[in-house]
Design a protein with these regions (language model features):
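M16 family metallopeptidases and their MPP-like homologs
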Residues: 4-31, 53-59, 110-120, 146-254, ...
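Non-catalytic, conformational "gating/processing" segments within enzyme and secreted inhibitor domains
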Residues: 5, 38-74, 272
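Short beta-strand/turn micro-motifs at beta-sheet edges
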Residues: 42-46, 99-102, 157-163
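Proteolytic maturation boundary segments
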Residues: 63-103, 247-281
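Short, solvent-exposed amphipathic alpha-helical segments in soluble enzyme
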Residues: 72-76, 131, 149-151, 190-191
C-alpha cells in the first residue's frame, strides 16, 4: 500500500462493502498484524493450508500414472482439516451515492475513483460487464480514452474494469486529471458515456471488435502450458467446471448488444456507487 496509488482499491472497497470481508485488506491492517500472535497464524495455517482446501494442477508432457504416484508420495501424509464452511455475510445494496476522500502521501496527481457492486464471477452478467469495460477503456480507440485523453485532453489516463470475484464483483472506474482539470469534470465526462451505453446500443462493428479483442486475450492467456494450468486451476476452484476452458469463448461470443445496454442500466446507476476523491497528502 506504500506504492503510489497502492491503496486505491482499498479506498473503494472499504466504502462499498460494510459487511462482507471484501471491504478489508487480504492480510489485514497494520493494527491487525500487530495484534496477532504466532498461535493465530498457526491456527490459520492449520485450517486453510490443507490438501482438502487446495487445487493442484500438473500440466505438460507427463506420465499420468507416474504423476499420480508422485502426488501420493509427496502429499498423502499431509493431514486434512475440517471442511472450510464459508458463511459470509450478504452485502446490503447501495441505494444512494457514497462520497469519500482518501489521502495518499505518495502521489502528486489526484485520482477520481468510482466503484459499483456487481455480480459474482460465475455469472453471465459478470462477463457482460467485462465486455463493457473493454468497450469503455481498453485501448486508444475505446470511447473513454478517445474522448477524455485524445480528443478533449482532460485526462492523463482513464480505465474501467470489472473485478469479478467469488461472491461479488467490483466495477471500478479510474481517471487521472490533466493539469487543472477537476475530478468533478472527469466524473461528468464518464457519466455522459455511461448514460449513452445505458440508452443506446453499441454498433455491430464495435461488438465484433470487442469479441475479437476478448478472443485474442483468451488465446494469449492460454498459449503456454503455464497459462493453461492456471486457467484450469481457476475454473475448478471458482467455477467447479474445468470444461469452461473449452466453452468460455462461446459464452462471450453469444453476448448481445442488448445485454450490454441492459446490464449497464441495471448496475451502473449513480445511486448505486461510491465516489472517492483520491488526493495527495
Amino acid at each position: 500500500r506504500n506504492a503510489p496509488y497502492g491503496a486505491l482499491l482499498y479506498a473503494v472497497r472499504s466504502n462499498l462493502y460494510k459487511k462482507h470481508p471484501y471491504g478489508r485488506l487480504t492480510i489485514g491492517l497494520d493494527k491487525d498484524l500487530t495484534a496477532a500472535d504466532i498461535n493465530d497464524f498457526k491456527k490459520f495455517n492449520a485450517r486453510y493450508h490443507k490438501p482438502n482446501n487446495a487445487t493442484l494442477v500438473v500440466a505438460g508432457d507427463i506420465d499420468v500414472n507416474q504423476t499420480k504416484e508422485m502426488v501420493e508420495k509427496y502429499f498423502a501424509d499431509i493431514p486434512s482439516s475440517d471442511d472450510v464452511v464459508r458463511n459470509l455475510p450478504k452485502e446490503d445494496p447501495i441505494e444512494e451515492t457514497i462520497r469519500s476522500t482518501w489521502y495518499d502521501p505518495n502521489i502528486q496527481v489526484p485520482a477520481l475513483l468510482v466503484g459499483y457492486i456487481t455480480p459474482k464471477m460465475n455469472t453471465r452478467e459478470a462477463r457482460v460487464l467485462s465486455i463493457l469495460s473493454t468497450y469503455l477503456s481498453d485501448g486508444k480507440s475505446s470511447v473513454l480514452y478517445k474522448r477524455m485523453v485524445d480528443d478533449n485532453k482532460l485526462a492523463l489516463a482513464v480505465q474501467t474494469v470489472n473485478l469479478a470475484q467469488e461472491d461479488y464483483g467490483t466495477y471500478l472506474m479510474l481517471a487521472l486529471p490533466l493539469g487543472e482539470i477537476t475530478l468533478e469534470k472527469l466524473l461528468s465526462e464518464i457519466d455522459e458515456e455511461i448514460e449513452k451505453v445505458k440508452n443506446e446500443l453499441i454498433t455491430d462493428r464495435d461488438l465484433e471488435k470487442l469479441q475479437n479483442t476478448l478472443e485474442t486475450q483468451f488465446v494469449n492467456r492460454n498459449a503456454s502450458i503455464e497459462g493453461i494450468a492456471n486457467s484450469l486451476s481457476d475454473y475448478y476452484t471458482f467455477y467447479g467446471d474445468t470444461g469452461l476452458i473449452n466453452s468460455e469463448l462461446d459464452i462471450y461470443r453469444s453476448i448481445t448488444k442488448e445485454e450490454i445496454r441492459d446490464v449497464a442500466k441495471k448496475y451502473l446507476n449513480s445511486n448505486q456507487r461510491v465516489i472517492v476523491d483520491y488526493l495527495p497528502g
